[in-house]
Amino acid sequence: MKSVSKNLNSNISQKLFYLIVLILFLRVDLVFENNTPTGGDMGAHIVAIDTFIKDFMPNFQINGWSNDWFGGYPLYYFYFPLPAIITFFLNLIFPFGIAFKIMVVLSIILVVYSIEKLMRKTSNQISIYGATAGLFYVFTESFTIYGGNLASTLAGQFSFGYSLAFANLSIFYLLKSNNNFRFPISSIFLASCLLSHLIPFIIYSPIYAFYWLSRKQNFNQKILSISIFLALVSRWSASLIMNLEYTTNMSYTPFSRIEDLIKKDILPIIFILIGLLIAKHKNLIKNKTLNLFELYLIFSSILLYFFVPEGALWNGRLVPFFNLGIIFLLSLIHISEPTRLTS
């Protein structure tokens, strides 16, 4: 009993430590000032979410028509409603400005939490390496508009952050959770991923499908998970697909240089990673430390970056996934007892 109590207290202390670090960096004291957040594209989301809360939700709508700009425009037909829904519920307790800022901050906290969860050896034991990896990931500053890190929230990429976090949690519950309903829970997170942003959903769907098909699970649980996913995403996805012809082409010029994929703050990590792979290759092969998931993130990002057709996906958006794969791989190699995502 003493050993269990000691481990529990240690686990709680570690969680509190990383939570305090996040709070200090995220300036929660400013979050609770009742003002209107601005900065970059984030400020442009305020009108949309305000309209969503005042006009759509009271009428049980997730999209509709807004008269806030020129002759009006369709709102949330082509963008992702879940962050606005989260803000709506926060706004039941807090003023709009505070609710909006809490929603943005929660996206960063969830990204760190999801990375930490994926790095756990067991479902209930916090991973120090995972929490450190999560903090490092969100504090990278070599890109500011692609999503996933703290700097990108000012570009309105909190939606991407939510989607990435939910994608990670869907993989965690699919592979590592001991919950009897891990398949339905995983499908809820996958649906939340899609309802937050499309790009992480596209990147994670192939590896999720592979794990989903390869896992031995009660057939009814799998049917239930599919039903839950479709029930959650069908309404918004149907309106998106039916009106897809009206979407605009952003006409981004794709990157072609390797330095646009490998940013300066991740480059030292890659050198360290290469050194560790060379030094520990025998142990890595023996212990089977390397897993499909992080290798998939790295190599799919590289392949899509150089070979994705122009216009299908702006290849700059692959940088967050490449960085995440590198950070995952480095963290796993540092762990003396291998942490397997497929355990």
Show which residues each predicted segment covers:
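Membrane-embedded transmembrane-helix bundle of lipid-linked glycan/lipid transferases
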Residues: 2-336, 340
